[in-house]
Amino acid sequence: MGSEMCIRDSMNIEKLSIKQIKDLMVKECNDELLTAIKNDARKGVQSIYKSYQREMKERQRVANLYTFENGCRANGYKLIAGVDEVGRGPLAGPVVVASVILPENFFIEKINDSKKLSEATREKIYDIIMKNAIAVNRAIIDEKTIDRVNIYQAAMNGMYEAIYGLNPKPDAVLIDAMPLESLDIYHQSIIKGDAKSASIAAASIVAKVERDRMMNEFDKIYPQYGFAKNKGYGTSEHLEALRKYGPCEIHRKSFEPIKSMVMQK
């Protein structure tokens, strides 16, 4: 009560402790209080102000990631799914496609294209998504299917599977780049969508985390290839292991240089 009276009385926050100011920020943050904090020279108070500015900047960044979703809602669509795939480029392992329906304008700190995030941040956001999403689904396309139908078709098939397996069903779908011409749900294909849409970013994170976990398990079975580190991508160490040991069961036999290795046998 005393603190509130003091704040109301000409914003005399210099009489308040750092803890009291933090508590007040939670209870009644307003322009007058922010101005008083900005003008308080104490280092601790300035730290509070800078932290608040960072949080507001992050909240605005995340809010901007819902531009496509809110555009869909303005046209009457309620359940908007984001879809993305991970693993088209590696020489080994599956393609993983994920689809995610997030609550409307749900704030997830640091959400972004999974490639721009550290492993620890991806894991943290993954847990938030799995706990709070309206729906999550994923499709895993193994290396044998990739070799049989080609990587582009495999990824496309995975997207259809991930979308149609959602429960509840989406009203609209936001897709990272790939056109899905046969999809009978309203959809938009967005170039670099995982950096422009929160729903697509969430899907990219789910797909990335789950594929990385799979490659970590494959590393235990085939330790010579370093899958836990390279995730199946063609690093110099991985290529050297291929030359030394040849391909293993999860290598994509239709990808070079593995295709040539198999043909030479």
Predicted regions and their residues:
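Short, small-residue-biased leader/transition segments that mark boundaries at the very start
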Residues: M1-I7
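RNase H-like, Mg2+-dependent phosphodiesterase core
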Residues: R8-A81, R88-K265
